Curated annotation (Swiss-Prot):
This protein binds specifically to 23S rRNA; its binding is stimulated by other ribosomal proteins, e.g. L4, L17, and L20. It is important during the early stages of 50S assembly. It makes multiple contacts with different domains of the 23S rRNA in the assembled 50S subunit and ribosome. The globular domain of the protein is located near the polypeptide exit tunnel on the outside of the subunit, while an extended beta-hairpin is found that lines the wall of the exit tunnel in the center of the 70S ribosome. GO terms for cellular component: cytosolic large ribosomal subunit. Pfam families: Ribosomal_L22. GO terms for molecular function: rRNA binding; structural constituent of ribosome. Keywords: Ribonucleoprotein, Ribosomal protein, RNA-binding, rRNA-binding. Belongs to the universal ribosomal protein uL22 family. Part of the 50S ribosomal subunit. GO terms for biological process: translation. Coiled coil: none annotated. This is Large ribosomal subunit protein uL22. The gene is rplV.
């Protein structure tokens, strides 16, 4: 059987790219079962977002290519910037400031070990 690249994307996640990248660094290059364990015990909110995307990638591998979970490892985790919501925050003396609420994207690529 030839090697297959499996991709899953999470777009518009309510976390900044820098916070997502802290968790993504934990799982790059790891086996999928080890990566899931890392994410399960990581206490950051963005670990839940990345865990969902990783589970989606594993489901894609099993449904589309019939690949066993034990043969997969995390080849790449790409974290990028998504849209930013702009909000107004009232300040003193009738002024206003902008508040930016940043969102992020995550792309996980799994590869099969033979």
């Amino acid at each position: 059987m030839s090697k297959v690249l499996i991709v899953a994307k999470g777009m518009g996640l309510k976390s900044t790219p820098s916070k997502l990248n802290l968790v993504a660094d934990l799982i790059r290059g790891k086996d999928v079962s080890v990566a899931m364990m890392y994410l399960k015990f990581c206490r950051k909110k963005s670990a839940g977002y990345i865990s969902k995307v990783l589970k989606s990638a594993v489901a894609n591998a099993q449904a589309n290519y019939n690949i066993d979970l034990d043969n997969l490892y995390v080849k790449e985790v790409l974290v990028g910037k998504s849209f930013s919501l702009r909000r107004i925050h009232a300040r003193a003396r009738g002024k206003a400031c902008r508040v930016y609420k940043h969102y992020g994207n995550v792309i996980i690529k799994l590869f099969e070990r033979i």
